[in-house]
UniProtKB/Swiss-Prot annotation:
Classification via HAMAP family: Pantothen_kinase_3
Keywords: ATP-binding, Coenzyme A biosynthesis, Cytoplasm, Kinase, Nucleotide-binding, Potassium, Transferase
Record's function text: Catalyzes the phosphorylation of pantothenate (Pan), the first step in CoA biosynthesis.
Family named by the database record: Belongs to the type III pantothenate kinase family.
Subcellular location: Cytoplasm
Enzyme Commission number: 2.7.1.33
Pathway of action: Cofactor biosynthesis; coenzyme A biosynthesis; CoA from (R)-pantothenate: step 1/5
Organism listed in the record: Burkholderia ambifaria (strain ATCC BAA-244 / DSM 16087 / CCUG 44356 / LMG 19182 / AMMD) (Burkholderia cepacia (strain AMMD))
Assembly with partners or alone: Homodimer.
Co-factor: note: A monovalent cation. Ammonium or potassium.
Record GO cellular component, one term: cytoplasm
Protein name per Swiss-Prot or TrEMBL: Type III pantothenate kinase
Residues the record lists as binding substrate: 96, 103-106, 189
Length: 262
């Protein structure tokens, strides 16, 4: 089967897509908002008709309906598969006690990470609306994870639920901290809030990495992904690897496995 696969990652903040060729290479990519207010619709008119669409959607029913409408407008009747976490798939074994409770984005990311770093123990940190951590052993066993508020959500919660603290976006906070992160403590409220929430992210990652390395008594590669990864990386004292296509790469593997079974 040489037809490309359309891959869609509908996250809590935006929707990313890619077209994967027969070698699972992402040959076209893009992103758009949950609604038209979040930006223009994707222009898929120049793309070849794909074999089908494989979708990870953690954004809910309204986004699912929007995706269906976009796909039907471009390719009426295109087969589509909305993935769910499985007990085992593409070389990864799901360690959740109830496997289908694991978010489909995290599942696809685990599959993508195992393919990107075969034979390595991994801690995968993804920075979105939530910050998620996944522990993946070299043999493909996902042993569990952690979920915390993301950097933006932490700052928004403080601004919303206090009388005197500002509500800061990550763009504002990143600008405030440019050149200021070398100082361990900040000297005004906006920078103190920005740095405190950022260091909370970094501290979580470093504690989890050390606990994992101690528990496994082996080297663990730290892999960072997601929108706030650059900012969090500057606050880390650990070596790390950046990879921003784990979910789409995992979807490409799931799509290839599914197409081979057709």
């Amino acid at each position: 089967m040489n037809d490309p696969h359309l891959l869609i990652d509908a996250g809590n903040s935006r929707i990313k897509w890619a077209l994967a060729d027969a070698r699972r290479t992402l040959v076209d990519t893009g992103a758009f908002g949950h609604t038209r207010d979040g930006g223009a619709d994707p222009d898929w008119s120049a793309l070849p008709r794909p074999h089908g669409a494989w979708i990870s959607n953690v954004a809910g029913a309204d986004v699912a309906a929007r995706l269906d409408a976009l796909l039907d407008a471009c390719w009426p009747g295109l087969p589509r598969t909305t993935i769910r976490s499985q007990p085992a798939q593409c070389g990864v074994t799901n360690g959740y006690t109830t496997p289908d409770q694991l978010g489909s984005d995290r599942w696809a990311g685990l599959i993508g990470a195992r393919a990107a770093f075969p034979g390595e123990h991994l801690l995968i940190a993804t920075f979105g609306t939530a910050t998620t951590l996944e522990a993946l052993r070299a043999d493909g066993r996902f042993t569990g994870g952690l979920i915390a508020p993301g950097w933006a959500l932490m700052m928004r919660a403080l601004g919303t639920h206090t009388a005197q603290l500002p509500t800061l976006t990550t763009d504002i906070a990143s600008g405030l901290l440019a050149g200021a992160q070398a100082e361990p403590f900040q000297v005004d409220t906006p920078r103190s809030l920005s740095a405190g929430c950022l260091y909370a992210q970094a501290g979580l990652i470093e504690r989890a990495w050390r606990d994992l390395a101690d528990a496994w008594q082996a080297p663990v590669r730290l892999v960072l992904a997601g929108g706030a990864a650059d900012d969090v990386a500057r606050a880390l004292t650990l070596p790390h690897t950046r990879h921003d296509a784990l979910i789409l790469s995992g979807l490409a593997l799931i799509a290839a496995e599914g197409a081979a079974q057709d």
